[in-house]
Regions:
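Basic, Lys/Arg- and aromatic-enriched nucleic-acid-binding interface segment
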Residues: 19, 34-100, 104, 124-126, ...
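Catalytic-site neighborhood detector that most strongly recognizes the C-terminal catalytic loop/helix
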Residues: 56, 122-126, 209-234
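C-terminal secondary-structure termini that scaffold catalytic or DNA-interacting sites
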Residues: 67, 71, 143, 156-158, ...
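Short, polar N-cap/turn motifs at the start of nucleic acid-interacting alpha helices
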Residues: 110-117, 181, 200-220
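Active-site/catalytic core of tyrosine-dependent DNA strand-transfer enzymes
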Residues: 134-180
């Protein structure tokens, strides 16, 4: 397996993709063994996937991306609609923590505007969740509802729902906005870090992200939480000292 990993790295395959492939291979072998097929023993070897540092959008980058997703900047109707869809899906992901595939298959029937929530089935962990909507997200989806017909919030040109087009549109906007080192998944990370920096409980963030275990959330965001805690601690030095004892005459 270690030789295979090195081969894929030389081909330019990213570590995160290799990790997904290796997990899928391991899952197939386990299922085959469970069904009674003979699966020879194999060794994974010594190899490590290099985790990237947690990257999230800052307060300057988000407006630049939204500017590049402004549909009024293009005249062609087809591109205008496509850019509007990309803008709406960007707002959905950064305000609700959706994965790109979850956002792409969202149906109008799964949105309850009266209660301000989105009902979501997360196929990755096989559970049902509901995500409260921010005012910004609710307004975005209500406005989209006026012009989009059919079952899906982000329909494809020939029916069904959009898939890879959403990802390409977002990556193109990142490039035009000169925001580097990000993908569509970083909106989800931005959603989580903004909650944590405002004091949200890690278990609440876990459920909103749809992680099966809080350990997954802690592993992904532990460094961020620690760094923010250190910053808040150092900020105490900039505050005037408050006397703890009252002077009694």
């Amino acid at each position: 397996m270690s030789r295979w990993v090195e081969y894929e790295r030389k081909r330019g395959i990213k570590d995160i993709t290799i990790r997904l492939w290796s997990r899928q291979f391991n899952k197939i072998c386990r299922n085959a063994n469970r069904l009674g097929y003979y699966v020879p023993e194999y060794e994974w070897g010594e190899w490590n996937i290099k985790d990237k540092p947690n990257r999230y959008l800052n307060d300057e980058e988000e407006p630049r991306i939204l500017k590049e997703l402004d549909p009024s900047s293009v005249q062609d109707l087809k591109h205008n609609n496509g850019r509007q869809a990309a803008r709406d899906i960007f707002i959905l992901m950064i305000n609700a923590g959706f994965r790109i595939n979850e956002a792409s298959v969202l149906k109008w029937s799964e949105i309850n505007f009266d209660n301000g929530v989105i009902y979501l089935y997360r196929s990755k962990v096989s559970n049902d969740d509901f995500i409260p909507m921010t005012k910004r997200l609710c307004a975005t989806l209500l406005n989209r509802r006026k012009s989009v017909e059919g079952e899906y919030v982000f329909p494809g040109r020939f029916g069904g729902y959009k898939t890879i087009q959403n990802n390409r549109a977002l990556e193109s906007a990142f490039s035009r906005a000169e925001v580097t080192g990000v993908s569509s998944h970083n909106q989800r990370k931005t959603f989580a870090t903004r909650l944590l920096i405002r004091g949200a409980a890690i278990t609440d963030v876990q459920h909103l992200l749809g992680h099966a275990s809080v350990k997954t959330t802690e592993k992904a965001y532990a460094a961020f939480v620690k760094n923010e805690r250190f910053k808040q601690t150092i900020d105490l030095l900039d505050k005037p000292v408050q006397p703890k004892l009252k002077v009694v005459n």
